[in-house]
Amino acid sequence: MVKILVTDPLHEDAIKILEEVGEVEVATGLTKEELLEKIKDADVLVVRSGTKVTRDVIEKAEKLKVIGRAGVGVDNIDVEAATEKGIIVVNAPDASSISVAELTMGLMLAAARNIPQATASLKRGEWDRKRFKGIELYGKTLGVIGLGRIGQQVVKRAKAFGMNIIGYDPYIPKEVAESMGVELVDDINELCKRADFITLHVPLTPKTRHIIGREQIALMKKNAIIVNCARGGLIDEKALYEALKEGKIRAAALDVFEEEPPKDNPLLTLDNVIGTPHQGASTEEAQKAAGTIVAEQIKKVLRGELAENVVNMPNIPQEKLGKLKPYMLLAEMLGNIVMQVLDGSVNRVELIYSGELAKEKTDLIKRAFLKGLLSPILLAGINLVNAPIIAKNRNINVVESSTSEEKYGNAIKITAESDKKKFSIVGAIINNKPVILEVDGYEVSFIPEGVLAIIKHIDRPGTIGRVCITLGDYGINIASMQVGRKEPGGESVMLLNLDHTVPEEVIEKIKEIPNIKDVAVINL
């Protein structure tokens, strides 16, 4: 009999599903020692965010086949350790989409009609009908930043209120946005100028941190209302505070903050700020969905079926996985680089295999590449199983081919194009490490780590030096560097490994240097 251990509170409907495939023991509030003891006999472990499934817990698991996370994030699970032991990790990335979208609309309405302030006034015994005059959503323009799962749910609900929708998402094709009834804009500043309401639904990355900053807030209408139910850090809270205090925009409604819980946050002293304590997924329905979705995923895995929400990888023979795994990691890295270099809606990608790879079944490599390609632009839920489906839904045309040319041995070449530019890169595994061998036709031999900068330039004396000086002026250390060129004085490419991420203002400074043609900074 399959033994299923549940160590965090789980909806009763999820328990019933699990009971169809095994003997369920619910043991919440376990100490670390108790968990280490109970995990020995478990075939399945189901957790939420409370249980920490660390490497030592996984190493104690003698029979464990599946770990189920009833929710999205897997920060509390050592996925690498699970993968090493062949344990499949599944989650429920779609469980909270509707709940977050509904909270977004709720906060939007509350801010527009001053509902929290009016409620507080009424409870103080006041009856002030003039002070809390609000505005309608009908006929207003809503700017949606990020048109993924949650953003799309917000669009549906906003349209029901009669709102006009404009969207900013450089990774969504125009025709996909149009099919949702969204006018796609190319520039976030244009969205900020035109929108009466602005809502954010993007992941927090070095690129999206303070995506709404002082410049964007200065462009907003005096009556603008901004809503954030995504991630703290997307908005420059200092700039937002100043604008709200000075009456430059109407209001803000926040479910997330840069520091949680917020300590002495001046935003919470303002009457035109309303908020909730990160309640996006805190609904009965979302909790039920998280439990039942992950329970169904566990059922599929136990029955030998392919589950859609596998976090680490499909259940494949270990011998095959051992051979392909280095190239899967290489492909994922190349995909990550390609998306961040193109920085736009990817239209077409070709994967070209050479050497022994040309004779292999490459489906897993393609899936790994797509996972890497999509990871920089999705909040959560991208994995080897669903990456091809998501790519197809985004109209990304993927072609695979092989070549008898063995210039680099077992190598993967990627050629890709967006609506803005084209890019190609070749990578291989050398001494068990992923190595970049070619960038846009320029030969190099470079091991990318941490933060990678790819800078195209004209090969002129002093150009590289000025780039290095600019980085140094901003306290950004260069760990390693290489230049690829075809001939002296012609177009060249420099690759740099950096110890720190590069702020947008530094990238702009580098672009201003004479002979610099293009700058791309990739966070690996």
From Swiss-Prot:
Single GO molecular function: NAD binding
Pathway: Amino-acid biosynthesis; L-serine biosynthesis; L-serine from 3-phospho-D-glycerate: step 1/3
GO biological process entries: L-serine biosynthetic process
Gene3D superfamilies from the UniProt entry: 3.30.70.260, D-3-phosphoglycerate dehydrogenase, domain 3 (3.30.1330.90), NAD(P)-binding Rossmann-like Domain (3.40.50.720)
Principal EC category: oxidoreductase
One family name in Pfam for this protein: 2-Hacid_dh_C
Cross-referenced PROSITE patterns: ACT, D_2_HYDROXYACID_DH_1, D_2_HYDROXYACID_DH_2, D_2_HYDROXYACID_DH_3
Catalytic reactions of this protein: (2R)-3-phosphoglycerate + NAD(+) = 3-phosphooxypyruvate + NADH + H(+)
Amino acids binding NAD(+): R149, I150, D169, C229, A230, R231, D255, H278, Q279, G280, A281
Residue intervals passing through the bilayer: none
Domain ACT: 452-524
Entry keyword set: Amino-acid biosynthesis, NAD, Oxidoreductase, Serine biosynthesis
NCBIfam families: PGDH
Homology family: Belongs to the D-isomer specific 2-hydroxyacid dehydrogenase family.
UniProt-recorded name of the protein: D-3-phosphoglycerate dehydrogenase
Organism: Methanocaldococcus jannaschii (strain ATCC 43067 / DSM 2661 / JAL-1 / JCM 10045 / NBRC 100440) (Methanococcus jannaschii)
